[in-house]
Amino acid sequence: MGLGLHLLVLAAALQGAWSQVQLVESGGDVRKPGNSLRLSCKASGFTFGGYGMFWVRQAPGKGLDWVATINTDGSSQWYSPAVQGKFTISRGNSQNMLYLQMSSLTPEDTATYYCAR
């Protein structure tokens, strides 16, 4: 059975309906177990380099789970035990981009992934 890893592409107004803050994810796809995938998140409307950033995920029928956090300059990262050693969070402050490199995927990684600040 193949692993369906789904990414919901969205623009999230994080500070209310009037806000110009947006986080737009891309890169979701279907992958077989053991394969890799990289998710991207383009930020706009705020000083990206001034915020720690997060990835969270929601498995079908479940609540939100924290995946990983990266500090403002990318020098420190923290991971959920479920993804430690498999996923890598990184950022490109000059491009306002956040990334999640996912490897050794398993059926348990099937989820909608969201970036957040």
Curated annotation (Swiss-Prot):
Organism: Caiman crocodilus (Spectacled caiman)
Name of the molecule in the record: Ig heavy chain V region C3
Keyword Signal: yes
UniProt keyword annotations, A-Z: Adaptive immunity, Disulfide bond, Immunity, Immunoglobulin, Signal
Region: Framework-1, residue numbers: 20-49
Biological process annotations from GO: adaptive immune response
PANTHER family: IMMUNOGLOBULIN HEAVY CHAIN
InterPro entries the UniProt entry points to: Ig-like_dom, Ig-like_dom_sf, Ig-like_fold, Ig_V-set, IgHV
SMART domains in UniProt: IGv
Disulfide bonds, paired cysteine numbers: 41-115
Region of interest (Framework-2), residue spans: 55-68
Residue segments, region Complementarity-determining-2: 69-85
Span list, region Complementarity-determining-1: 50-54
Keyword presence, Ribosomal protein: no
Pfam entry (one): V-set
Region annotation Framework-3: where it falls in the sequence: 86-117
GO cellular component: extracellular region; immunoglobulin complex
